Each structure stands twice: as C-alpha cells, then as structure tokens.
Amino acid sequence: MKKEIGENVHIPVGSVILEGRLDVPENTDRMIIFAHGSGSSRFSPRNKYVADVLNELGMSTLLVDLLTTRESIANAARFDIQLLTQRLASVTHWIKEQPVFRNYHIGIFGASTGAASALGAASLMPDMIRAVVSRGGRPDLALPALPLVKTPVLLITGSLDDEIT
C-alpha cells in the first residue's frame, strides 16, 4: 500500500523531545503506537516487521522511543513504568492534537515493559485508546492500573517463555 506520510518525528513531552518513526498509508483512520521494552528502541526488527505488515494492511504506525538516549542508558528509567506510562499518554495526546489524526482510532502495541506502559496509558485514556496488544508483555508491572483498564486487550506470549506464561 502506498504511504502518504513516512517520516521521522520529534515529539515534545515535558522537558524532553522523544524520537519516533511515523508511517501513514493512504486512506486510513487507524494508528498503532508501538511501546517497546527496556533495552530496545524504535529500530527493533520485530516491531519494525509488525509495523510494516500493519502498514500494508492500511494502518498507520508510530514507533517511538519513550526515553531519550541518555535516559535509556540509565537502568532506573528503563524500568520506571509510571514514567513510561505518562510518556506514552503524552505521545497519544500529541497524535490526537495533530489535525490530520484527530479522528483516528488509536491502538497500542506494547512489548515487554512497553506492554505495562500500554496498559497504564489505557487505564488513563479509555476513550482515546481503543485496543492494546501485548507481545511478550509484563502486565504484572502495571498491577495497580489493571482494574481500571476498560480497553480490549490481547496478550500474546510464547509457550516457552517461563517469565511470561
């Protein structure tokens, strides 16, 4: 499917600028925001593959780093689910503030700790986030938020992943 927009974006969130990759096929009203896990980035081959497939199916994608380069080096920030949740919520608001995306349906694809932040953001924004997909996620890291999640959630785990299953 032909892409209408394919660009690197810089998203202001508080005192930092987050970097991401935005791909928008023609004639769509759906956006999937990717929240990757600790130790990964928007360049994750797995997430890029899933994003490419979603683009081919006519869905827009935003692969975003929820931490700056400096923050991702510090172990504490990589596992700060509250910070990651707030950043993901801010990124979601940023998308909805863009006139072209105002009426888009938003879903979150979270991997590992990114799934915990996706669930946290969904608990804060039930009317804005329409679905959450967790790939190898850690919903246990979002326990306080789980009772508040009203959004449909799909949990995908590997059968040999003892930490997850």
Predicted features, each with a name:
Residues 160-164:
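Acidic catalytic loop of the alpha/beta-hydrolase fold
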Residues 2-9:
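Short, hydrophobic/aromatic-rich segments at coil-to-beta transitions
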Residues 149, 155-157:
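Short beta-strand/loop motif that positions the catalytic acidic residue
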Residues 110-118:
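Gly/Ala-rich beta-loop-alpha elbow adjacent to hydrolase catalytic centers
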Residues 127-139:
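A conserved short beta-strand
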Residues 94, 120-124:
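Active-site signature of alpha/beta-hydrolase-fold catalytic machinery across serine-
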Residues 9-104:
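Serine-hydrolase catalytic machinery in alpha/beta-hydrolase-like enzymes
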Residues 107-110, 135:
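Short beta-strand immediately N-terminal to the catalytic nucleophile in serine-hydrolase-like folds
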